[in-house]
């Protein structure tokens, strides 16, 4: 039995709702997508609910689900993925957080991003914190880009049900950290101590003395949120399916999810996760990786951003760019030897300007696939697709089965 | 982001099977329903299994499921809903029962409804029981309509797994109460004592002395069944979804379910839950309530009765009356600002003359809805609908998501 390779392409936030400006079509229906339409003709469509019908998914929970894990059982916060995504090496019992450098004046947060402090300044401040703050557990504090940083408390995973101190708007004092159980109460106490001591170090740091003199907002306070630890999964993707798996991703959060479950992660030059990303660089990298890997996951972010920005025409254009990315891949593989799945991690309808619980159209084409009657890729056409309405966690098993890599249960 | 309002219309027992008398159509397919057909064109259809495929649902379990609760986890008997539905104020730890006044002669139940005793006589007898029966717990005993009454044991909710003493046919002695655990064993003992003492009070009551002289069956015994307590739900509907919710209902059992989960319940003049109900009074009330409420639930009962009575043409006529009720609502709202769902709580096929486990056609139309290819509302057309085949408990999350009232899980 021939084993096929798998290509999973996630166009972030792909699904949408009918839009007047597009004549009642969705961006995917409006866009000119000859390659995806061709794949729809020779393949099979359906709708997938990333988590369950009507439930908006986050990017992290949606990817966990699409990679086959029940997010209600596996998800334990975003921080761990963010930390992996910025290149930290973590242990499974570490607890990680997203951090903002912020400005505190007279007990009130006056700027949640410390005047968008530069990456260089932030890294220097992070170093000072790492060297001078003393708390009862080992920690890693690392600057990411701009005002963003990551905090890791070693060995504190059990306390992941801890809240945040971010008031989420300027003019308010920091929140006290909340907790849901004894283990996270301990973490909350450590975080309060950490924030207090970091404030002392930051407030008198030469970089902030200089910013103060220049009239710039000082980066003298830390806002900590998004506690997260290693997802509670029975087995890493690569072990579970016995495949060599690679991901082509630019966004830290999604990189982190892919790393956490065993993918080798690549970010080709030019891939940014922003509107200006180089999708053809991703296509070339994917084709190259298909030589060595059994399963390649390609993530395309900007479709989601266009939904958040309520820009239907831009979303349609980005889908057309994604179509060209997919064409390059299709042109460089033998479709008999590959199973290609294309979907979104969730819907980000322009009218909602956020993730929604609408199902996401799904396309599977390649070797072994039973073609249905569908003619093009789109929300309405997917409703009559042969895959029916499935859950996000069904996608990978269906792919692996078409790839002839599943195992029989029973005799 | 605009938040929409929701209208959920339940045509009780709507689903049916093909009927020779209707040329092989179902009553819904046979009926002339221009408004629902219009909504099907601009909206989306599907099939919903109230509980799960092939499983007939009761009206209480079906409504619990459609309101988003798993009835296998949440349902704890019907009595509580009946008691709420007849206007009793209950605490969450109360245990309630449906009661019949019945006739006992020589140790045998000779009439399960005591000659359909009048409401006035029954209320007088109920008063005598309330005043003269002494058992080890506080109780409320209240006459409803005709031979029907309600019993509430205060604070005894834990014992809801108690059986009944109703032999369900005349000529048999009352059953002893059964039980499934220690808490319900105690309730069974209390009920045996209650029934015995009530029998003593009733048997010598002047009303029964008079009935005996007139040759009428005496109402000297109580048949107690349908033990029920507050449903085991994580949160009331109104709290869970942060909406102000109203119900337009006439039937006690469904009223009770709606009250239990936080709805304000209205029964406009003329709404009876019988064939003679005034559906236009319901429509007007619903439109009025939409000014103040975020979510309005309208229940239409007689379609179910026509199924129980195996009267296909009457069922079709009732569906046409429901269509006019829906037209009034559609004419008085802006469909861009509202999400309307129409379905049944279960199928009541004429050939079955009872609830069946057939899936129920479902229609959703209004703002944000992705239209599918369907053209009219009916069982067969629903099979190719874009909603696919979902569960009853998916309906409200899908509505709330289109109403832009859901919250993201994950980051």
UniProtKB/Swiss-Prot annotation, chains A, B:
Free-text activity regulation comment from the record: Inhibited to approximately 20% by EDTA.
Enzyme class: isomerase
Pathway: Carbohydrate degradation; glycolysis; pyruvate from D-glyceraldehyde 3-phosphate: step 3/5
Keyword terms: Glycolysis, Isomerase, Magnesium
GO molecular function: metal ion binding; phosphoglycerate mutase activity
Keyword NADP: no
Catalytic activity: (2R)-2-phosphoglycerate = (2R)-3-phosphoglycerate
Cofactors required: Mg(2+)
pH-activity dependence text: Optimum pH is 8.0.
SUPFAM superfamilies: Alkaline phosphatase-like
Pfam families according to UniProt: Metalloenzyme (PF01676), PhosphMutase (PF10143)
Family assignment from sequence similarity: Belongs to the BPG-independent phosphoglycerate mutase family. A-PGAM subfamily.
Role according to the record: Catalyzes the interconversion of 2-phosphoglycerate and 3-phosphoglycerate.
Self-association and partners: Homotetramer.
NCBIfam families (UniProt xref): apgM, PRK04024.1
Protein name: 2,3-bisphosphoglycerate-independent phosphoglycerate mutase
Organism expressing this protein natively: Pyrococcus furiosus (strain ATCC 43587 / DSM 3638 / JCM 8422 / Vc1)
Gene name tied to this protein: apgM
């Amino acid at each position: 039995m021939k084993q096929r390779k798998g290509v999973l392409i996630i166009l972030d936030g792909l699904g949408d709702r009918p839009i007047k400006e597009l004549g009642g079509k969705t961006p995917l229906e409006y866009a000119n997508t000859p390659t995806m339409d061709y794949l729809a003709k020779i393949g099979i469509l359906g709708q997938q609910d990333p988590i369950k019908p009507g439930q908006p998914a986050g990017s992290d929970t949606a990817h966990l689900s699409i990679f086959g894990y029940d997010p209600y059982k596996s998800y334990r916060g975003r921080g761990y993925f963010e930390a992996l995504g910025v290149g930290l090496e973590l242990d499974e019992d570490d607890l990680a957080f997203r951090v903002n450098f912020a400005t505190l004046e007279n007990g009130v947060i006056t700027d949640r991003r410390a005047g968008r402090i530069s990456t260089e300044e932030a890294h220097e401040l992070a170093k000072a914190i790492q060297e001078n703050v003393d708390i009862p557990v080992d920690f890693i504090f690392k600057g990411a880009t701009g005002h963003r940083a990551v905090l890791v408390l070693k060995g504190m995973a059990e306390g992941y049900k801890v809240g945040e101190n971010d008031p989420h708007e300027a003019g308010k004092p920091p929140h006290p950290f909340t907790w849901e159980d004894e283990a996270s109460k301990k973490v909350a106490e450590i975080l309060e101590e950490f924030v207090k001591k970091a404030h002392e170090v930051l407030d008198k740091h030469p970089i902030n003395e200089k910013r103060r003199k220049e009239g710039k907002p000082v980066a003298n306070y830390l806002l900590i949120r998004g506690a997260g630890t290693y997802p509670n999964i029975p087995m890493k993707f690569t072990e579970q399916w016995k495949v060599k798996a690679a991901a082509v991703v630019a966004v830290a959060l999604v990189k982190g999810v892919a790393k956490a479950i065993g993918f080798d992660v690549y970010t080709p030059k030019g891939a940014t996760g922003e509107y200006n990303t180089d999708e053809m660089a991703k296509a070339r990298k994917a084709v190259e990786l298909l030589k060595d890997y059994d399963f390649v996951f390609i993530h395309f972010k900007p479709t989601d951003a266009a939904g958040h920005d309520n820009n239907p025409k831009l979303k349609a254009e980005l889908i057309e760019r994604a179509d060209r990315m997919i064409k390059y891949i299709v042109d460089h593989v033998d479709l008999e030897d590959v199973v290609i799945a294309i979907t979104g991690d969730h819907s980000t309808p322009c009218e909602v300007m956020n993730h929604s619980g609408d199902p996401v159209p799904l396309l599977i084409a390649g070797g072994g696939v039973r073609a249905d009657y569908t003619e093009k890729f789109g929300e309405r056409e997917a409703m009559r697709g042969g895959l029916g309405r499935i859950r996000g966690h069904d996608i990978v098993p269906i792919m692996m089965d078409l790839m002839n890599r599943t195992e029989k249960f029973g005799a």
